[in-house]
Amino acid sequence: MKAKFLIEPFPHVLLEDYFTKGEWEACIRELRKLDPHLLPPEFSGTARHKETGRPLKFNSGLFLTEAMPNSEIVQFARNHMYQELVSQVDCSWWESQWRQNNSQSWMLSRYIDGQYYNAHVDLSQFTLLIWLYQEPKPFTGGDLIFPDYNNYTIPCNNNTGIIFYGPLRHEVPPIKGSGRYTLTCFTSCQNPALVSTR
């Protein structure tokens, strides 16, 4: 896994080749098994419009933390999240904040033709996203956009990802094609007394 810390236009970490080849293949097998069980927005957690209360997303998802606590995808992702990642981040204050996270919630989402997630914020301190799909890329659109930062855009390439502050407004425009999966980890520090050094 390769990690690159960027300070502009806001502090974030770009991730490449997140899973090894063997891990990626195991992830794809697990995705195929989970796919029929993914739920619509009303049942899979979603940010909602402040005035109407309607879901801001149109995709399918499942919280793996509750539904599949022994998920291989989650186990593989955790293997790369701390020592391997922070050894590549040359920013002590960011590293300190990242290490303090002691609570994780994992979600798997699927975006297919016409699906999207309107601009919203997350309740997490950090949000980690990893994109997965089988090559060749079976869709267009669906990149990650930060509208408050001049539409700063992160392409959702296979086996890549990003870590950013959850309260930053972000969105996913509609996808055209058969789509992709997103593995999301919402992290936070629930109890500072429980913080361990990783």
What are these regions (language model features)?
Residues 87-198:
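Catalytic core of non-heme Fe(II) oxygenases with the double-stranded beta-helix
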Residues 1-93:
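Non-heme Fe(II)/2-oxoglutarate
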